[in-house]
């Protein structure tokens, strides 16, 4: 079998293009989800990490029945430390975070535009997933 420089170049370019296309397809399927928690020395941060691990299923991970991730296909969730409830609500409302832990009073104040959120537009799109 004889190889030419042009043939090797063409094969190399084809391999790079194929790899690039495959990587682009995987990258397009990825979804990221952030969970605002609390300080790293407190309870909410590790709880957020457990939730993030439970809902994540990165591409290439083992199947659920083989001991791998059982979460949402293509999702990479991460717990992010924060200064707490007010910080988490503000981060969600600004689009910086997808979700976050918040005390019920802070969530209520954000929803109604009262309390520590007095003077701000009521966050009528804010939703509760669970009470801690």
Where would I find each of the regions flagged by the language model?
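Bacterial N-terminal signal peptides that target proteins for export
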Residues: 1-13, 19
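Short, glycine-/small- and polar/acidic-enriched structural segments
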Residues: 28-132
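Cleavable N-terminal signal peptides
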Residues: 14-15, 25
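Sec/Tat signal peptide C-region and signal peptidase I cleavage site
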Residues: 21-27
């Amino acid at each position: 079998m004889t190889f030419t420089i042009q043939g090797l170049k063409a094969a190399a370019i084809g391999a790079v293009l194929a790899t690039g296309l495959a990587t682009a397809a995987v990258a397009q399927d990825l979804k990221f989800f952030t969970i605002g928690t609390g300080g790293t020395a407190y309870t909410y941060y590790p709880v957020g990490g457990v939730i993030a691990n439970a809902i994540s299923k990165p591409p290439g991970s083992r199947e659920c029945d083989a001991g791998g991730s059982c979460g949402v296909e293509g999702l990479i969730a991460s717990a992010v430390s924060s200064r707490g409830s007010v910080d988490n609500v503000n981060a969600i409302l600004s689009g910086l975070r997808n979700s976050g832990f918040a005390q019920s009073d802070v969530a209520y104040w954000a929803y109604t535009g009262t309390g520590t959120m007095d003077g701000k537009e009521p966050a009528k799109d804010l939703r509760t997933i669970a009470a801690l």
